[in-house]
């Protein structure tokens, strides 16, 4: 069966050299997504519903007719990205064998740059074989890596953990996945030895780096600043449909309901934005710092927080040197996003289980005599 599935298209390697990642073509993710929607044809389906939405809205007696029409139009527009994302997931689920073969060939690891070649080859394969209408399926190597971790790596490891029949189907229906997982683990282990074995450079200016607890009056002020920086109105565009659902309420109630809904969603995003912003190699360096400190005192966690804040700012992972508020926040982050998910037997979406880091998380726990926070 493996002989029948091509690793590359019939046009050969020279054709792939003409492809590049959407990250290098489009201005940002939004323009890329709009382009993908335009090429997919879903927007034509949506436009066909606009006259009906306007007519039904103007004829509605629930609320102001014009406002109802506007809300319906916005709801149709908001549906397009959702449909596009779901369709891309469906396409990916049918191409896991090809993705696994590309991984086996390129042997990527923790670093996102390792995945750029995999993303380019996979994008061009889908386009040339008419499985996708453009050569821009994955925006960059990071997206390709995360897709592998969620659709192949986590199910394979979870199946090993509990031998759950729900996960056994991936090995039966999708060949090469186990080999791809093994190749990935081998490369990650080699990169871990390089990261952890590298002699730590003394950060001479680390003593001058202030933690947010030393510059803000309280943690609430720091949290509000974080929420303000990370807030994006586009994230809440689909919530506009809530106005239509509750159109029989007064305008004041509608506004209050929407604001409260957005507030709680922002708090949830506030909890998840930090682990999402860290790539696998950033997490490996964070765990290496914990192991190297060899202790669980507040002072050592403060040191880890300073190192991480400085490093993530220098790598442009974070906009400022305020990733962690203090050592306690740093320790709580370790508990929530690493220790609590260790050897989990089920997915913790939207959080990553970090299954490739489990043995390093254990080592970090042992090095600092870790005890969960109360």
From Swiss-Prot:
Localization per Swiss-Prot or TrEMBL: Membrane
Topology in the lipid bilayer is annotated as: Multi-pass membrane protein
Record bears the keyword Ribosomal protein: no
Which Pfam family, giving just one, matches this sequence?
Answer: DUP
GO CC field: cytoplasm; endoplasmic reticulum; endosome; membrane; nuclear envelope
Topological domains, Extracellular: 60-62
Instruction: State which ranges are Cytoplasmic (membrane side).
Output: 1-36, 86-374
Task: Give the GO biological process terms.
Answer: endocytosis; protein transport to vacuole involved in ubiquitin-dependent protein catabolic process via the multivesicular body sorting pathway
Q: What is its main location?
A: membrane
Q: Which domain of life is it from?
A: Eukaryota
Can you tell me where the transmembrane regions are? 37-59, 63-85
Question: Any extra detail in the entry?
Answer: Present with 2370 molecules/cell in log phase SD medium.
Q: List the protein's name.
A: Protein COS10
Lineage at the top is:
Eukaryota, Fungi, Dikarya, Ascomycota, Saccharomycotina
Underlying gene? COS10
């Amino acid at each position: 069966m493996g002989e029948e599935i091509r690793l590359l298209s019939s046009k050969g390697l020279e054709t792939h050299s003409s492809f590049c990642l959407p990250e290098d073509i489009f201005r940002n993710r939004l323009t890329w997504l709009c382009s993908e929607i335009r090429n997919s044809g879903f927007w034509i389906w949506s436009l066909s519903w606009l006259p009906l939405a306007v007519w039904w809205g103007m004829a509605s007696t629930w609320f102001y007719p014009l406002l109802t029409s506007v809300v319906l139009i916005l709801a149709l527009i908001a549906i397009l990205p959702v449909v596009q994302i779901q369709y891309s997931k469906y396409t990916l689920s049918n191409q896991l064998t090809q993705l696994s073969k590309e991984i086996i060939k390129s042997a990527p690891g923790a670093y996102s740059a390792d995945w750029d070649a995999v993303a380019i080859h996979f994008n061009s394969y889908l386009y040339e074989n008419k499985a996708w209408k453009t050569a821009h399926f994955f925006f960059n190597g990071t997206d390709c890596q995360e897709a592998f971790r969620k659709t192949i790596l986590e199910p394979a490891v979870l199946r090993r953990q509990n031998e759950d029949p729900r996960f056994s189907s991936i090995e039966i229906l999708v060949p090469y996945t186990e080999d791809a997982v093994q190749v990935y683990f081998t490369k990650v282990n080699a990169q871990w030895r390089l990261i952890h074995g590298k002699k730590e450079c003394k950060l001479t200016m680390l003593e001058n780096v202030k933690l947010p607890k030393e510059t803000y009056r309280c943690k609430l002020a720091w949290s509000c600043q974080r929420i303000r920086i990370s807030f994006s109105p586009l994230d809440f565009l689909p919530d506009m449909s809530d106005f239509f659902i509750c159109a029989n309420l007064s305008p004041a109630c509608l506004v209050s309901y929407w604001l409260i809904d957005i507030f709680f969603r922002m708090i949830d995003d506030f909890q998840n934005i930090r682990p999402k912003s860290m790539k696998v190699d950033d997490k490996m360096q964070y765990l290496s710092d914990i192991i190297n400190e060899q202790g669980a005192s507040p002072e050592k966690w403060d040191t880890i927080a300073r190192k991480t804040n400085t490093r993530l700012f220098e790598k442009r992972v974070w906009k400022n040197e305020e990733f962690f508020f203090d050592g306690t926040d740093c320790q709580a982050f370790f508990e929530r996003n690493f220790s609590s998910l260790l050897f989990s037997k089920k997915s913790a979406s939207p959080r990553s289980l970090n299954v490739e880091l489990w043995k390093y998380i254990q080592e970090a726990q042992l090095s600092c005599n870790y005890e969960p926070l109360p």
